[in-house]
Each structure stands twice: as structure tokens, then as C-alpha cells.
From Swiss-Prot:
GO terms for cellular component: cytosol. Keywords: Hydrolase, Metalloprotease, Protease. Coiled coil: none annotated. Belongs to the peptidase U62 family. One of its GO terms (biological process) is proteolysis. It is an enzyme of class 3 (hydrolase). GO terms for molecular function: metallopeptidase activity. Probable metalloprotease. Its EC number is 3.4.-.-. This is Metalloprotease TldD homolog. It comes from Haemophilus influenzae (strain ATCC 51907 / DSM 11121 / KW20 / Rd). It comes from the Bacteria. InterPro entries: Metalloprtase-TldD/E_C, Metalloprtase-TldD/E_cen_dom, Metalloprtase-TldD/E_N, Peptidase_U62_metallo, TldD, TldD/PmbA_N, TldD/PmbA_sf.
Length: 482
């Protein structure tokens, strides 16, 4: 893989390992702790269907290099959208300005150590996994399926995207690493209407594999067909929904995608930069009980073919499974190289960046809660009056206070231990640690989301995974309209 990526990114400009060592030498007489080069090629393609016709098709290709130098807590960063010696030299001259001139102690490595991690996905180009005709056929199949599912379907929108990336990382700590990253996603949105009332449903999936995955047959149906039917089902549920109640009440969260609440309310607060700056609710709490003892939460970038998985992170560190909270006790934070060094701990393979034009920072990969021991039916049976929320929409969280607001996209009343009427307009309002300490039951099956997650932080978006088993929160504020 290293040879293939080098041939793509370096060979066309006659760049060699020795040439790149010389780039580090430009910065070597400054008081710099660490420096790295991040080369990237990306190709992305998307198709959009609306009203039964292809409304949009796009293709974009980009390549460039980011140059970073770190001195203490200061970072110098420059990037170029051309990969050549002159651009690298200009970037290196720019970033070294963050540090004082010093004598000796060159930071430039004498040689690189090639990182040979376990591959977490196949090194394929998903743009080439289906012909243009088959990609369009897939979107039309989704459209036909959704419309045939129910006469109340009035509008179907679907998008199909695929991304191919090659990255190469070189650093003054001797790191030399490369990765080839495929990524695909199918997104479906359906609008239904009855007696003047309109509601929407959505579904989607994806991961690090080829587009042909959507044509595979599972449980007697093509995957894309199943996703289209699920979008219609969700829309029809909301069409018959009544107004959600409001107030303090028990809530049962479904398995899988509702883990997005965990991601936002807990996950971001466990990223190393927030804790180094003491701006997280979890700062200084390692070894303390921060959630219910029923909760064990991990961030695992090693799961094969998952959207949030990485063979290496964007600093060349192999991904790993990090236990963040075990039996309710905080174990540690997610780290990149800079924050790990400043905090005196090891990096965890969580250094991520949107592209060569962005700085790396601690980010999640696939963050989820492990299974418990309760049966799902027992969770529902234990609630006299409350809400069951199997699907979430958007949400937001304040990292410092831990307070969050999340809207449900599908929810039901629980009455006398049984799931009854669907409800609309339910929002969950609370504080991360407080809510996590009120988890009293955790189901015995954990699920990951379908592969649609995108996480934003400081203007950067990266693909992520979330997940959890179904779980019961004894008391949380539900914002509703009734």
C-alpha cells in the first residue's frame, strides 16, 4: 500500500523520502517539538434523485499537502493544493515562524519507521464499484420501491455518494504511514400526505466498502429496497402520531442510532483537547464514577468496514479500541499526538482531520455502549407512563456544562408497560453526567447505527459511527406539545 500511495502522491513530482527529510531540516533549527506532513488525494462523486429524475451528478478531485509544526501549545500550519517541492518549502518556511531559533538538537529523523497496521477495510475505489448506469438504476429502484409501498407517498429524494482517499503521513517522530480509504453512503427521504397532513421519514446506510453492497440481498430483499421501505414506514408512523407529552418522565431509548445522544452528551466531553483546556464537564474525573455502573462505553476504530473506522488515524497511529468508561468509572480520554504529549499520556489513535487543509484534533471513531443483561421487553414493562424513542433527529450539546437538547424523529407512548401510540414533537432535555447516572436498565443486545453519521467540530466534518443497546433512563425532561 505504501508504494501505491507514494506513486500516486509523491512520484509525479519527483519527491523522495530524502527530499521530505530535507523539508523537516528547514524547521530543524527552531524550538519545535514535533512536525508532520500530510499528503492527500481525494475523489468524490454524488448522484441526487428527486421527483423520479436525476437532478444532480457531481465529481470532484482534490490533492494537496498540509505542513504542521508544534512548539509547546503553539501550532504553525500551512497547506498547498499542489504537491511539489516548491510548495513544501514555502509551507515549511511559513510554519517554522511559530518557534524561536535554537542551536543543535535537530528534530528531523534520520530515517522513517514504516507503520504496518491491520487493514480495517479493503483498499478499493468505490467510485469504480458500479457503472454509472447501475448507480442511476439504484436510485430509481429506491424511488419505485418507496412509491409502490404506499399510495400516500408524494415525494421521494435519494442521494448516493462515494469517496476514495489516499493519504500519506510523515512525521519527525519517525512515522511513515499510508492508507487507502473507501467510503459510501445512500440517503433516502420520503414525504407522505393524508388529509392535508404531511410527514417525513428517512433512512440511509453506508460504510467503507463498494457501492455494490447496496445491491446485496438480505432477508430476501435487496438492501436498498429495505432502506426505502424503512423510510416509508417511519413517515407513516409520524402521519398517525399524536402530540407528545411534556414533563419529567422515564424514557427508553432504542438500540443503534439513539447512541448519537451518547456521542454528543458524553463523547465530545471525553476528547483530550477539551480536557487539557479544562473546558469539559469530565475534566479531572478519571477514576471517578461519572455514569451509572451499568454503563461501559468504548471508542473503537478497529471494526471492519464501519463508517467511523480507520486503519490509521490522520497522524499515522493505528486505530484501537479505547475503553472510555468502564462500569460507570471514567478510564481516560481520546487523544491525538499533541494533546497526549502535553497531558503526559499515550496517543489513542484519535487524531483526525477533514482534509489536508485542516489541522488534526482528537475526534471520535465508532463510539458506543456495550450490552447489559436486561431483556428489551422488561425495559418497556417497567415503565408505567413514559416515552420509547427508537430514532433521533438533530441535537446539540454544550461541552462545558454537558447540557443537551435532542429531537426524536420517531417516538411512542409507553402506557402501563406497553408501547402504544406514536407521538410527534418529543425532545429530550438534560445534562450528560446527570442523565447517564439515571440509567437503570441496559438491554442485552448492542447495535451500531446503519452507517450515516457525520460529526462536526470546530468547522471540520468527519465520518463517525454511534451505537448502544436499548436502555432505560429513569427520569429526563421531555419537551412536548401536550
Amino acid at each position: 500500500m505504501l508504494n501505491q500511495v507514494s506513486n500516486t502522491l509523491l512520484t509525479p513530482s519527483n519527491l523522495s523520502t530524502q527530499t521530505l527529510l530535507n523539508i523537516f531540516d528547514i524547521m530543524s533549527h527552531r524550538n519545535i517539538d514535533y512536525a508532520d506532513l500530510y499528503f492527500q488525494l481525494s475523489q468524490d462523486e454524488s448522484w441526487v434523485l428527486e421527483d423520479g429524475i436525476i437532478k444532480e451528478g457531481s465529481f470532484h478531485i482534490d490533492r494537496g499537502v498540509g505542513v504542521r509544526a508544534v512548539s509547546g501549545e503553539k501550532t504553525g500550519f500551512a497547506y498547498a493544493d499542489q504537491i511539489n517541492l516548491a510548495s513544501l518549502q514555502q509551507c515549511a518556511e511559513a510554519v517554522k515562524g511559530i518557534a524561536q531559533v535554537k542551536q543543535g538538537n535537530l528534530i528531523s529523523p534520520s530515517a522513517f519507521n514504516v507503520v504496518n497496521p491491520i487493514a480495517r477495510y479493503a483498499a478499493i475505489n468505490p467510485l469504480e464499484s458500479l457503472t454509472k448506469e447501475k448507480k442511476i438504476e439504484l436510485l430509481h429502484l429506491v424511488d419505485r420501491t418507496a412509491r409502490a409501498e404506499d399510495h400516500r407517498v408524494t415525494k421521494v429524494s435519494a442521494s448516493l455518494s462515494s469517496v476514495y482517499e489516499e493519504v500519506l503521513i510523515m512525521a519527525t517522530d519517525g512515522t511513515l504511514a499510508a492508507d487507502i480509504r473507501p467510503l459510501v453512503r445512500l440517503s433516502i427521504s420520503v414525504l407522505v400526505e393524508e388529509n392535508g397532513k404531511r410527514e417525513r421519514g428517512s433512512c440511509g446506510s453506508g460504510g467503507r466498502f463498494g457501492l455494490d453492497w447496496f445491491f446485496e440481498v438480505v432477508d430476501g430483499d435487496i438492501r436498498a429496497v429495505l432502506f426505502a421501505k424503512e423510510a416509508v414506514r417511519q413517515a407513516l408512523v409520524n402521519l398517525s402520531a399524536v402530540a407528545a407529552p411534556a414533563g419529567l418522565m422515564p424514557v427508553v431509548l432504542g438500540a443503534g442510532w439513539p447512541g448519537v445522544l451518547l456521542h454528543e452528551a458524553v463523547g465530545h466531553g471525553l476528547e483530550g483537547d477539551f480536557n487539557r483546556k479544562e473546558s469539559s464537564l469530565f475534566t479531572g474525573k478519571i477514576g471517578e464514577q461519572v455514569t451509572s455502573p451499568l454503563c461501559t462505553i468504548v471508542d473503537d476504530g478497529t471494526i471492519e468496514n464501519r463508517r467511523g473506522s480507520l486503519t490509521i488515524d490522520d497522524e499515522g497511529v493505528p486505530s484501537q479500541c479505547n475503553v472510555l468508561i468502564k462500569d460507570g468509572i471514567l478510564q481516560g480520554y481520546m487523544q491525538d499526538k499533541m494533546n497526549a504529549r502535553l497531558m503526559g499520556v499515550s496517543t489513542t489513535g484519535n487524531g483526525r482531520r477533514e482534509s489536508y487543509a485542516h489541522l488534526p484534533m482528537p475526534r471520535m471513531t465508532n463510539t458506543y455502549m456495550l450490552a447489559g443483561q436486561s431483556q428489551f421487553d422488561d425495559l418497556i414493562a417497567s415503565v408505567k407512563q413514559g416515552i420509547y424513542a427508537p430514532h433521533f433527529g438533530g441535537g446539540q450539546v454544550d461541552i462545558t456544562s454537558g447540557k443537551f437538547v435532542f429531537s426524536t424523529s420517531e417516538a411512542y407512548l409507553i402506557e402501563k408497560g406497553k408501547i402504544t401510540k406514536p407521538v410527534k414533537g418529543a425532545t429530550l432535555i438534560g445534562s450528560g453526567i446527570e442523565v447517564m447516572q439515571k440509567i437503570s436498565m441496559v438491554a442485552d443486545k448492542s447495535e451500531l447505527d446503519l452507517g450515516i453519521g457525520v460529526c462536526g467540530k470546530e468547522g471540520q466534518s468527519v465520518p463517525v459511527g454511534v451505537g448502544q443497546p436499548a436502555l432505560k433512563i429513569d427520569e429526563i425532561t421531555v419537551g412536548g406539545t401536550n
